[in-house]
């Protein structure tokens, strides 16, 4: 085309676009989210392609000024009716729900959105379904509750806050009852409820029927075999991330399956498998554990047959890692992490664990009386290769003295520490005596106690000269304590001996002498209150004078 024709075509369509907006006024009320998830047109074009076709110039043979009709066929009329479908199992996927709805003759599904727990991403058992006509919604409300979906009859309700709160309460009750009984929820038939299924079976606002990506891989589904087969275009659902109950031994992956490397970059969000849950009895890098079968567990590849039940769990489980699960065996050893309680640790010459690992989640192995599942060699004393702790027995010097004995101090260091301790002792005694003479016994006692603790914590506390300093401080402390508690009674006893008064008078004097300290403190507090009252009166008088002056 020539340049002039292009300019004419572009600016001539402006009027048509305004006519189209007036003709399809119902589109103003359509949410942008609904436009994205709406089904394709009859000609197989995506919504983006339709928008692009709207802006294409007409052909040369068309009349530009006549306002030709648009070449896009709109199948969505802008009407959208939302329903809640509840009483579903947690492993029900959007494909299952779509098949059940299509079996009723309803083909205008616009949206299926499952409500999920924020903590683990597990379905709450109800979903929001949007259809494009009133007849479809009535058909769903009448016929779908009569259909059985995974052993349960769905409940179809209108979309409002009342039914939403009812479904939320029901999901909380089911979660709490499952936790109280100590058992996980019932899993899908033919597989283990604790198997690590990839995420992607349940749609999050996607149009139902989307084929999942080809890079998904199923995890092990039981104690020793691959998961059950699923139909084409349908992925297995996700289990709860933290199922209660004792973990069992993992099974090998299906034959001929290649797992992606653990550090190959983050996958797409929709195709990302859920992070594996690690228990304290499971090495890092292995698939999640399945339930215990009735009878002896099958042998684990690469570790030999376990002779008995798994050891009890010790400590809290570590947080789920960001790596996909890997099978044991020839794929390589797990990452540099501390071993679980029932497996031997690395040899003493092995490198320490990575800095991002919290050692508190991986306690060292203890002798719990259970046989280990590995007999390749005696386990070392410490998983990090540290020397064994020194056992002093029930009696012996404390650890500080042992450190002093191991690393002897030089003469200069010893004299420096001793001079420091002497200065602390002399200053503490002088200050305590001055405080006690002023009547502040609490400050004097605190000063002496602090000095004693500082000298005891020094490196030369085991020396005889240091012990002499400590004993002098303790004698001063006892003297001040006895003086603070019994000063009044001593005065009265001396008066008794000098004046030989009667017992009644001595009792009176004792009570008076005991009350003198209290009266002294009370009088001081009263004086403080009087000063405060005087200050308040002065402030009030000043305020009054200021107000009077302003008038």
UniProtKB/Swiss-Prot annotation:
Region spans: Necessary for interaction with NUDT21/CPSF5: 81-161
Basic residues bias (residue ranges): 504-514
Annotated Pfam families: RRM_1
Stretches for region Necessary for RNA-binding: 405-551
Chain positions covered by the region annotation Necessary for interaction with SRSF3, SRSF7 and TRA2B/SFRS10: 481-551
Chain residue ranges for the region called Arg/Ser-rich domain: 490-551
This protein's UniProt keywords: Cytoplasm, Methylation, mRNA processing, Nucleus, Phosphoprotein, RNA-binding
Record PTM Phosphoserine, positions in chain: 494, 500, 511, 513, 525
Localization per Swiss-Prot or TrEMBL: Nucleus; Nucleus, Nucleoplasm; Nucleus speckle; Cytoplasm
Region Sufficient for nuclear targeting, annotated ranges: 510-551
Domain RRM: 81-161
Molecular function GO terms recorded: exon-exon junction complex binding; mRNA binding; ribosomal large subunit binding
Protein function: Component of the cleavage factor Im (CFIm) complex that functions as an activator of the pre-mRNA 3'-end cleavage and polyadenylation processing required for the maturation of pre-mRNA into functional mRNAs. CFIm contributes to the recruitment of multiprotein complexes on specific sequences on the pre-mRNA 3'-end, so called cleavage and polyadenylation signals (pA signals). Most pre-mRNAs contain multiple pA signals, resulting in alternative cleavage and polyadenylation (APA) producing mRNAs with variable 3'-end formation.
Protein known as: Cleavage and polyadenylation specificity factor subunit 6
């Amino acid at each position: 085309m020539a340049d002039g024709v292009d300019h004419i075509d572009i600016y001539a369509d402006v009027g048509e676009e305004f006519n189209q907006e007036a003709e399809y006024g119902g589109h103003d009320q359509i949410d942008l989210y609904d436009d994205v998830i709406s089904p394709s047109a009859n000609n197989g074009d995506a919504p983006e392609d339709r928008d692009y076709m709207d802006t294409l110039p007409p052909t040369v043979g068309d009349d530009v000024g006549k306002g030709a009709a648009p070449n896009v066929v709109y199948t969505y009329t802008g009407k959208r009716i939302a329903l809640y479908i509840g009483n579903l199992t947690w492993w029900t996927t959007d494909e299952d729900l779509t098949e059940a709805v299509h079996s009723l003759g309803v083909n205008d599904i616009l949206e299926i959105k499952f409500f999920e727990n924020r903590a683990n991403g597990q379905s709450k058992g109800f979903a929001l379904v949007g259809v494009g006509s009133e007849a479809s919604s009535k058909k769903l409300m009448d016929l779908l509750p009569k259909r059985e979906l995974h052993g349960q009859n769905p409940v179809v309700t209108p979309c409002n806050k009342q039914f939403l709160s009812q479904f939320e309460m029901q999901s909380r009750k089911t979660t709490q009852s499952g936790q109280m009984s100590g058992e996980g929820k019932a899993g899908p038939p033919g597989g283990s409820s604790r198997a690590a299924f990839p995420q992607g079976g349940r749609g999050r606002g996607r149009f139902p029927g989307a084929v999942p990506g080809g890079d998904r891989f199923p995890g092990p589904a039981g104690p020793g075999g691959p998961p059950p087969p699923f139909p084409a275009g349908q992925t297995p659902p996700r289990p709860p991330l933290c199922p209660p109950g004792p973990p069992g031994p993992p099974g090998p992956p299906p034959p001929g399956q290649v797992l992606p490397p653990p550090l190959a970059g983050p996958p797409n969000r929709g195709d990302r498998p859920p992070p594996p849950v690690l228990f304290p009895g499971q090495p890092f890098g292995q698939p999640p554990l399945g339930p215990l079968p009735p009878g002896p567990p099958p042998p684990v590849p690469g570790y030999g047959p376990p002779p008995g039940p798994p050891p009890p769990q010790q400590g809290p489980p570590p947080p789920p890692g960001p790596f996909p699960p890997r099978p044991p065996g020839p794929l390589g050893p797990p990452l540099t992490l501390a071993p679980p309680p029932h497996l031997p640790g690395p040899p003493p010459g092995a490198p320490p664990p990575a800095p991002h690992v919290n050692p508190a989640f991986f306690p060292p192995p203890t002798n719990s009386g259970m046989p280990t599942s590995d007999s390749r060699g005696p386990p070392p004393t410490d998983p990090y290769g540290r020397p064994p702790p020194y056992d002093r027995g029930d009696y012996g010097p404390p650890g500080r003295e042992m450190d002093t004995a191991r690393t002897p101090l030089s003469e200069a260091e010893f004299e420096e520490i001793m001079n420091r301790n002497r200065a602390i002792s002399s200053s503490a005694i002088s200050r305590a005596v001055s405080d006690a003479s002023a009547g502040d016994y609490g400050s004097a006692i605190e000063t002496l106690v602090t000095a004693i603790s500082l000298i005891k914590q020094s490196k030369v506390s085991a020396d005889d000269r240091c012990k002499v300093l400590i004993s002098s401080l303790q004698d001063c402390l006892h003297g001040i304590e006895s003086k603070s508690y019994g000063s009044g009674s001593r005065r009265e006893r001396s008066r008794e001996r000098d004046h030989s008064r009667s017992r009644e008078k001595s009792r009176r004097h004792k009570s008076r002498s005991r009350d003198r300290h209290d009266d002294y403190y009370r009088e001081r507090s009263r004086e403080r209150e009087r000063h405060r009252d005087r200050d308040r009166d002065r402030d009030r008088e000043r305020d009054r004078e200021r107000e009077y002056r302003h008038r």
